Amino acid sequence: MFTSLHTPILHPRYCHHPTPSCTQFSPLALPPFHRTLSFLAPPPLLPAAPALSAASAAKPDKSGEQKWVHEGLIMESLPNGMFRVRLDNEDLILGYISGKIRKNYVRILPGDRVKVEVTRYDSSKGRIVYRLRSSTPS
């Protein structure tokens, strides 16, 4: 039934008589991590080449985006966290709340002074990133 192609390759440790099938297998020909005594033990980890960390690979470069930071006064409150903001240079823009301000439930009311990031691509909209504290105690 079995031909020469179907003869099993035996390990030299368990082969007690030298046959061509026993002598053709050499454990020293394999890389060192394949020479484990137990087939259940995983091969040892090899040192990996230094790579970029996951945090730096996931986030885009923030310094590449040019933004202007202006201070302004909230003129009008609009729906969905949008505000009319009068900047110090007398421009009137549409400001929306940043995620940190939304997450921390910072209250912004008309008359508050805020810091706004305005992108250079659309200077009519900006992100409100900070609510400035009022100078008068109330």
UniProtKB/Swiss-Prot annotation:
One Pfam family matching this protein: eIF-1a
Complex and partners: Component of the 30S ribosomal translation pre-initiation complex which assembles on the 30S ribosome in the order IF-2 and IF-3, IF-1 and N-formylmethionyl-tRNA(fMet); mRNA recruitment can occur at any time during PIC assembly.
Entry keyword annotation includes Plastid: yes
Family membership noted in the UniProt record: Belongs to the IF-1 family.
A GO term from the CC aspect: chloroplast
Keyword Chloroplast: yes
Protein name, entry field: Translation initiation factor IF-1, chloroplastic
Record's keyword terms, sorted: Chloroplast, Initiation factor, Plastid, Protein biosynthesis, Transit peptide
Gene expressing this chain: infA
Location in or out of the cell: Plastid, Chloroplast
Transit peptide: 1-53
Reported function: One of the essential components for the initiation of protein synthesis. Stabilizes the binding of IF-2 and IF-3 on the 30S subunit to which N-formylmethionyl-tRNA(fMet) subsequently binds. Helps modulate mRNA selection, yielding the 30S pre-initiation complex (PIC). Upon addition of the 50S ribosomal subunit IF-1, IF-2 and IF-3 are released leaving the mature 70S translation initiation complex.
Molecular-function GO terms, alphabetical: ribosome binding; RNA binding; translation initiation factor activity
Domain of life, per lineage: Eukaryota
Domain S1-like span(s) in chain numbering: 58-133
InterPro entries: NA-bd_OB-fold, RNA-binding_domain_S1_IF1, S1_domain, TIF_IF1
HAMAP family found in the cross-reference section: IF_1
Upper classification of the organism: Eukaryota, Viridiplantae, Streptophyta, Embryophyta, Tracheophyta
PROSITE patterns with a match to the protein in the record: S1_IF1_TYPE
